[in-house]
Amino acid sequence: MTEINFRNAQFLISAPSLRECPAEEGAEVAFAGRSNAGKSSAINCLTNNGKLARTSKTPGRTQLINFFSLGQGAQQRLVDLPGYGYAKVPLATKREWQAHLSEYLYKRKCLRGLVLLMDIRHPMQEFDTMMLNWAVDANMPVHLLLTKSDKLKRGAANNTLLQVNRSLKESGVQDLVSAQIFSSLKNVGVQQLEQVITGWLNLPAGEDEASVKN
């Protein structure tokens, strides 16, 4: 397995739709979540670059599909998808974002996995479930990142993780979906996230993690 130095990450391009995305070459992992779930902060924490992905206290500022290369040739990429569900924008705009997200998940052939971020205090909201269902329907590996774990005591955070994993097992998707606790503020869970993404980016084209395990 090829090791990845996430600190080499650099901004590549912003795309308003799938047509403007980089060429279907190499492999990429996407980050998705509600507008206040901490996507940009997680990417900045993972890459140890506080200025890589734009962060804002105003939810919904990420309205484009933002790509970051992880090395020369941009053959491995991280993707920051538009936040959903919380942003105070017109309904028509929300629907347009949802259409772009759905199109990206179903049609982007070089996408190897989806990191789905949820505030650990409010996991599995309506839009989270919608995104998870889209990914599962597309047979896309998903890693749930329960963010802002520093807002809870360790026992409460672990209990939430246990409940989420139980829900995944009851839904029968545990082979395709995993979960972990994460805090960009305290650097909790960074190494585990690195391992998951590295594994995905090393998957051969056309294979998912479940098929490799089997």
From Swiss-Prot:
Pfam families linked to this entry: MMR_HSR1 (PF01926)
Ranges of residues in domain EngB-type G: 25-203
Name this protein carries in UniProt: Probable GTP-binding protein EngB
Binding site for Mg(2+): 40, 62
Keyword Manganese: no
CDD domains given in the database record: YihA_EngB
Similarity comment: family membership: Belongs to the TRAFAC class TrmE-Era-EngA-EngB-Septin-like GTPase superfamily. EngB GTPase family.
Sample GO molecular function, one term: GTP binding
Annotated source species: Teredinibacter turnerae (strain ATCC 39867 / T7901)
Annotated GTP binding sites: 33-40, 60-64, 80-83, 147-150, 182-184
Gene3D superfamilies (alphabetical): P-loop containing nucleotide triphosphate hydrolases
Protein role: Necessary for normal cell division and for the maintenance of normal septation.
Keywords assigned by UniProt, alphabetized: Cell cycle, Cell division, GTP-binding, Magnesium, Metal-binding, Nucleotide-binding, Septation
GO biological process: division septum assembly
Native organism taxonomy: Bacteria, Pseudomonadati, Pseudomonadota, Gammaproteobacteria, Cellvibrionales
Cofactor: Mg(2+)
Gene Ontology cellular-component terms listed: cytosol
InterPro entries recorded: G_ENGB_dom, GTP-bd, GTP-bd_ribosome_bio_YsxC, P-loop_NTPase
